């Protein structure tokens, strides 16, 4: 994992913890909604990522962004 990947991963995790402290035990590769994230918190995270990384997450992609790992890859791809 390169430095950018690690920075983005840490930012995503820390953002989720700020949204709700119960999210500090999430697994990177497991479905976020199966781990207890609700849709409101998911949209809060998307908003935070759009603001921080100056990107726009397409609504059609929401269903694909169901793990922390997929969100990280999406942000990396959009930033390039």
What annotation goes with each model-predicted range?
Residues 1-24, 76-80:
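Thiotemplate assembly-line natural product biosynthesis machinery
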Residues 17-34, 54-60, 64:
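Phosphopantetheine carrier-protein modules
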Residues 41:
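Two-component histidine kinase catalytic core, primarily the HATPase_c
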Residues 51, 73:
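DNA-binding alpha-helical recognition surfaces that contact promoter or target DNA
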């Amino acid at each position: 994992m390169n430095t950018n990947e690690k920075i983005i991963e840490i930012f995503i995790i820390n953002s989720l913890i700020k949204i709700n402290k119960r999210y500090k035990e999430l697994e990177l590769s497991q479905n976020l909604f199966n781990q207890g994230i609700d849709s409101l918190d998911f949209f809060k995270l998307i908003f935070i990522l759009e603001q921080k990384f100056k990107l726009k997450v397409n609504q059609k992609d929401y269903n694909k962004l169901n793990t922390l790992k997929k969100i990280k890859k999406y942000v990396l791809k959009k930033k390039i």
